[in-house]
Amino acid sequence: MTTSIAGLESLGRVHFIGIGGVGMSAVARIMVSRGVPVSGSDVKDLPVMRDLSSAGARIAVGYDAGNLGDAQTIVAGSAIRADNPELVAAREAGLPVLHRSEALAATMAGHRVVTVAGTHGKSTTTSMVAVLLKEAGLDPSFAIGANVPALGVNAAHGSSDIFVAEADESDGSFLNYRPLIAVVTNVEADHLDHYGTPEAVFASFDDFAALLPAQGVLLACSDDAGARALADRTASKGTTRVLTYGTSDDADIRLHDGGPGDVSVALDGGVHKLELQVPGRHNALNAAAAFAVAVELGVEPGAAAAALGHFTGASRRFELKGRGRGVRVYDDYAHHPTEVRAALSAARSVAGDNKVHVLFQPHLFSRTREFSQEFAAALDLADTALVLDIYPAREDPIPGVTSTLITDHLVNGRLVSADEAVDAVAAVASEGDVVLTVGAGDVTAYGPVIVEALGG
């Protein structure tokens, strides 16, 4: 196959530093599908790297300047440090170095682009849109920050002119896209390590909405104060269309959420029942957004509603890891207080009259410092909250910032060490209960071990 998409042919051979990451592998997968010569490396030998190798990419495990080979363009992941030997060699050679979002934007050229942004719910909503459109026969290209069982992959090159992508606001890179349809699920203060102030976060979303053309549309959640304010500000400018979705009476796409089995959307006088396989009000709202996108792209409303029934979830988004001793164990990527609250609310709806136990791993020292009391309030929705040490990710420790900032405010929880965590969870869980591992770090690895400890 030869590259025929404008913006890709000028890149030449592309080398990805950190190709195993879910976002980086998504872009690499699409480029390989379009015939772009791709190579890449990562510090660990991850399953996705073997998939990419089988598809034709040249893959190396470990970082070494020699891995660049004859690359003409470099794509570096956000987690790649400035002293990475491949990045150092690329800069010394004068090679262009692209952010992942810039590389993804190049693959979008010539498409009708749908981007999904928001502080929470991006991956799930993007996944819902992609599954819905595929089931409706539109076969979009897509790039998602999570693996999606109903799609089999986190990214693919489709046959239509539609491209669906998750737009990450964490470092401002969502401003590199040029959407026709932009979904904003919610807007809250987060990633203050990058933005500095909540006002700067809100301003970045204004800039994002301003990217829409006159014939485009902003789809904003009316149930969220930040997204609703963004919709109002954007509408007042008159530069693009604005539609809202949610449970509020004045939403353009009205959601009714009476709990499992009683979810529907109303549009233009018609009411369409949604058969959702994922629990929680947040997922009902995400489904309403996906429905709105599909209708904007010409899918008949009834067909759009029916297609949502094929969505079974995304990896690390309230994902069932197994059962043991009558206890169901789920895993969720939630790493902001609002997300933790939504995940635990979903767990409550699944548990019924039984108990909910959460093993939480805070993500980033800066986020823990900013939201410690909010995390505690959210975690107290559980009957038992066990909190691990902070997962640092890209950050260096901040003096005085530890998980005790959270546990000091908990009513039903305490700090646990990595060594005691599994036994502590197993000791409190009884038949019918729900266990939830929560966080954006390596807490996900505890799920299968907990299932095993429960005899599953």
Curated annotation (Swiss-Prot):
Where does it reside?
Cytoplasm
The record's annotation in Pfam families points to: Mur_ligase, Mur_ligase_C, Mur_ligase_M
Q: Which SUPFAM superfamilies match?
A: MurCD N-terminal domain (SSF51984), MurD-like peptide ligases, catalytic domain (SSF53623), MurD-like peptide ligases, peptide-binding domain (SSF53244)
Binding residues for ATP: G118, T119, H120, G121, K122, S123, T124
Tell me the superkingdom of the source.
Bacteria
- EC annotation? 6.3.2.8
The catalysed reaction is:
UDP-N-acetyl-alpha-D-muramate + L-alanine + ATP = UDP-N-acetyl-alpha-D-muramoyl-L-alanine + ADP + phosphate + H(+)
Annotated metabolic or biological route of this protein: Cell wall biogenesis; peptidoglycan biosynthesis
What does the record give under GO molecular function? Answer: ATP binding; UDP-N-acetylmuramate-L-alanine ligase activity
Alphabetically ordered keywords of this record: ATP-binding, Cell cycle, Cell division, Cell shape, Cell wall biogenesis/degradation, Cytoplasm, Ligase, Nucleotide-binding, Peptidoglycan synthesis
Instruction: Give the first-level EC class, as a single word.
Output: ligase
GO BP of this protein: cell division; cell wall organization; peptidoglycan biosynthetic process; regulation of cell shape
Gene Ontology cellular-component annotations? cytoplasm
| Physiological role | Cell wall formation.
Would you identify the family this protein belongs to, as annotated? Belongs to the MurCDEF family.
| Matches recorded under NCBIfam families | murC
Q: What is this protein called?
A: UDP-N-acetylmuramate--L-alanine ligase
Q: Which organism is it from?
A: Paenarthrobacter aurescens (strain TC1)
- Identify the gene encoding this protein: murC
